[in-house]
């Protein structure tokens, strides 16, 4: 055996693979092992390789192979196996049972078997598509100092789902005691990446877990597939159909077949049952329907790419009595401004009375007023000017007219600013409810209905948020006997439209379509929206140890880069309601006018009371004069 040349080949292979740790399973004699190790200690490449020798002779049981011989913390560990040894068959079978022909181990299987003999040996082994296995056939050349090593790439698209062993020649190396050279390529593998050469899964049938919530599972598989394949009524099971169409694109890219496993929920608990449970227990290879990446699920699954967005909201129209506000006409100015404005008007009223008094006493008779107005009359003139009212009394003096000019100028400025603020506030947007959080909603008196979705029920059962517990206690437990607590999306949206104050909880990707169908543009702007649960992303999941992880990730990234994903998402998923309030006239409702009418009624009552007091006082005063002449 040409051990020096073999050591040089192994070292060169490790350098090309960027690996610094190797375990060598062999059946050499002690002096041969020493010779091989000495060549490793004085390598032709300036690198340090950690190596460990395992003598296969005398090993009777290869159980717990990975734990006993391959414990490491490196990204990849190289493993050399001498196929000519008698114990090789048992070792390779145990590696197949433990499923360690994967990307974490760089296998070098060295022997002189023909490709057909190697195929018969490895054909029954569980080798994965991400396997890094090389079969190396050595052949001593004529000069006896150089050895040719033909390297073959070995992988399987999936033994348990119909895949066949693939052995493809890669290249040939020629090694002498000093150096190794690549002499020729045996195929075109070097032109593409590892997964570029393995992207065609033509011989396997992938098992895909799919959720269907809007059709009974008693239907045949063909009927369910036909439903998921339809492109109309995008609001019905939109998330499941969105994921299904992405999976069909993946199928076309991989040129494979798929067997769909249908379920009516994502999971019964976090990782048990449903489509998620099928991937966890490895009865499915992939989830077509995106799901949440929770902490519990990530112990068993890997999220390979974002393929969705989850948003549940509570919508309701503002109740008619919720917008009644007594201070709507006082809002343009703060209390301090109102006090100062009233003080200025009072001061001007006093100045006007002084002006009229001086004019009556000091001016010439022809310029005098017929009578001296009272202080109350001048106050009335001042406050009337603030309301853009004229006056029948006009000062004759220049000073008095300057006071009038200042009064009307101040009133004009204040009035225009006041009316602009009031009108803009009344005509800008309708009254919105003050309910902005789930806690406020739970503490309100509003009636609640929910869309009967599996993940909504699961969230109510497993959420640890205190506001959700309060919501369940106040809104759910009190309606356990109410058959209308759980309503389909269409009925729930219609009830929101017809009953202001009714709250409906639904998933936006499907529910928004009904809102856009049954609500006018103005009614959409009137809606209040409260986030039912934190917004979360949906991911396509594989099992944590899936051998298809990297291949599927690359294919999904390709779908994302080409814009196909964005096109599908915009078609299937509705994430936002569009309010175009500037395109229509908003009517001012009673919620704004009622405070004004209330103030007018109160003023009328006050006037009547004052009138009655004045009449009573006059009557009393008249009687008093009659009895005391």
Swiss-Prot record:
GO terms for cellular component: cell body; dendrite; membrane; plasma membrane; sensory dendrite. Pfam families: IR75A_N (PF24576), Lig_chan (PF00060). One of its GO terms (molecular function) is olfactory receptor activity. Expressed in acetic-acid-sensing neurons in the antennal coeloconic 2 (ac2) and antennal coeloconic 3 (ac3) sensilla class of sensory hairs (at protein level). Residues 1-335, 396-402, 614-629 are extracellular. The keyword Repeat does not apply. Odorant receptor for acetic and propionic acid. Functions as part of an olfactory receptor complex including the ionotropic receptor coreceptor Ir8a. This is Ionotropic receptor 75a. The gene is Ir75a.
């Amino acid at each position: 055996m040409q051990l020096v040349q073999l050591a040089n080949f192994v070292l060169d292979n490790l350098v090309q693979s960027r690996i610094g740790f190797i375990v060598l399973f062999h059946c050499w004699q002690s002096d041969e092992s020493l010779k091989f190790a000495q060549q490793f200690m004085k390598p032709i490449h300036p690198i340090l390789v950690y190596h460990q020798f395992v003598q296969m002779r005398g090993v009777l049981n290869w159980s717990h192979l990975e734990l006993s011989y391959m414990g490491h913390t490196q990204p990849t560990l190289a493993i050399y196996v001498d196929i000519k040894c008698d114990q090789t068959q048992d070792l390779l079978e145990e590696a197949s049972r433990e499923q360690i022909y994967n990307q974490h181990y760089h296998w070098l299987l060295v022997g002189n078997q023909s490709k057909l003999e190697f195929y018969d040996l490895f054909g029954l082994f569980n080798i994965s598509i991400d396997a890094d296995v090389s079969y190396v056939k050595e052949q001593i050349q004529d000069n006896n100092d150089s050895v040719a090593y033909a390297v073959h790439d070995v992988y399987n698209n999936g033994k348990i789902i119909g895949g066949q062993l693939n052995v493809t020649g890669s290249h040939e190396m020629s090694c002498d005691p000093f150096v190794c050279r690549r002499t020729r390529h045996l195929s075109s593998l070097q032109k593409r990446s590892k997964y570029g050469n393995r992207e065609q899964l033509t011989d396997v049938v992938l098992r895909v877990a799919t959720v269907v919530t809007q059709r009974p599972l008693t239907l045949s598989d063909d009927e369910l597939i036909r439903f998921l394949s339809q492109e109309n009524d995008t609001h019905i099971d939109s998330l499941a159909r969105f994921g299904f169409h992405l999976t069909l694109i993946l199928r076309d890219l991989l040129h494979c077949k798929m067997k769909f496993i249908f379920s009516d929920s994502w999971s019964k608990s976090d990782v048990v049952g449903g489509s998620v449970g099928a991937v966890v227990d490895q009865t499915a290879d992939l989830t077509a329907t995106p799901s949440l990446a929770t902490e519990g699920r990530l112990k068993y699954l890997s999220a390979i790419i974002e393929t969705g967005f989850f948003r549940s909201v509570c919508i309701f129209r503002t109740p008619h009595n919720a917008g009644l506000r007594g201070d709507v006409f006082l809002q343009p100015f703060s209390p301090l401004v109102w006090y100062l404005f009233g003080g200025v008007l009072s001061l001007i009223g006093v100045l006007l009375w002084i002006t009229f008094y001086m004019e009556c006493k000091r001016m010439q008779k022809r310029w005098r007023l017929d009578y001296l107005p009272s202080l109350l009359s001048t106050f009335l003139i001042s406050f009337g000017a603030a309301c853009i009212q004229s006056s029948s009394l006009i000062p004759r003096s220049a000073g008095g007219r300057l006071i009038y000019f200042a009064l009307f100028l101040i009133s004009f400025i204040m009035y225009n600013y006041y009316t602009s603020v009031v009108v803009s506030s009344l005509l800008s947007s309708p009254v919105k409810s003050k309910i902005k959080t789930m806690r406020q909603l739970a503490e309100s008196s509003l009636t609640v209905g929910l869309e009967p979705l599996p993940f909504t029920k699961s969230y109510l059962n497993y959420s640890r948020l205190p506001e959700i517990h309060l919501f369940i206690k106040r809104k759910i437990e009190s309606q356990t006997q109410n058959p209308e607590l759980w309503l389909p999306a269409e009925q729930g949206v219609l009830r929101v439209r017809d009953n202001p104050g009714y709250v409906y909880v639904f998933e936006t990707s499907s529910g928004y379509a009904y809102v856009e169908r049954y609500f006018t543009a103005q009614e959409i702007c009137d809606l209040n929206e409260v986030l039912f649960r934190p917004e979360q992303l949906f991911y396509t999941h594989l099992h944590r140890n899936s051998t298809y992880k990297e291949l599927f990730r690359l294919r999904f990234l390709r779908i994302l880069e080409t814009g196909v994903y964005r096109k599908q998402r915009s078609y299937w998923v509705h994430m936002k309601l569009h309010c175009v309030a500037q395109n229509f006239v908003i009517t001012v409702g009673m919620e704004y006018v009622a405070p004004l009418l209330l103030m007018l009624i109160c003023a009328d009552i006050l006037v009547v009371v004052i009138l009655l007091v004045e009449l009573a006082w006059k009557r009393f005063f008249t009687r008093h004069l009659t009895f005391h002449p």
